[in-house]
Amino acid sequence: AAVRMADAYGCATIGIQYQQGLKDICAASDLVEGLLNNTHRPPVYASDGRELFAGKALPHFNEVDECAGLDALITYELWSQLGQPPENTLHDLRWGQHYSGAGVDDFVWVFLISGAAPPAHFADGYKSASSDRQPAMFFPKGGGTLKGVSKPGPIVWSRIYLEGNVLHADLGVGEVVDLPAEETARRWNGTTPEWPIMHGVIKGVSRDQMMAKHKANHIHVVYTTDETTAHKACRIKAAALAQLGIVVNFCGDVRFK
């Protein structure tokens, strides 16, 4: 239904208002949202038999976060042009702790979206994805999540926001690290174990700096194939956003060569 509505109204990105509007009257839509954000997803057909958005994701912004929706669409199209994996998502910026061990010695954030991430972000794609019933405390009518542990690799992170009636964007580079299963379980159980998790390291931005500057509880993330490309793609994305009239702020360690 969501994909058919997007086709009918000519939408390039959509959000479903189940938080807070629909959560008390219908099941949560996270499983659908995670699938729609994945390029390789089950096909959807129009009533006349056309396959809708064939071979592409339909970027979806969780909780109808319109700034995240704008970021999702721009990032998906730009990364596709750059030959990079275009699947992207927002996450809740929850909490973090310094972790030492297993090749990691850094402050590692808990990025946790409230229900669904694209399977392309998981280590083994769909094979490592699962679906849990949404916690009744948040979603009394249930609904399935799209859950997994995000794979290690370089990322570009960002946040588009409105300040002084002008669109701004903070962006930088980071890394997803691989933590041991017991540490992943500890972090999951300290937050919401039904939801997908990403172990995020934000390069050059401390915990206190992030908490002081970041303008939302959401952070947007997308992978690149290597670290050098992450820095280059971050710069290209900043240029694209600036050309659209968005005020850009580089945050942390972004290389300019």
Briefly describe each language-model feature range.
Residues A1-K257:
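Anaerobic metallocofactor- and corrinoid-dependent redox/one-carbon enzyme cores
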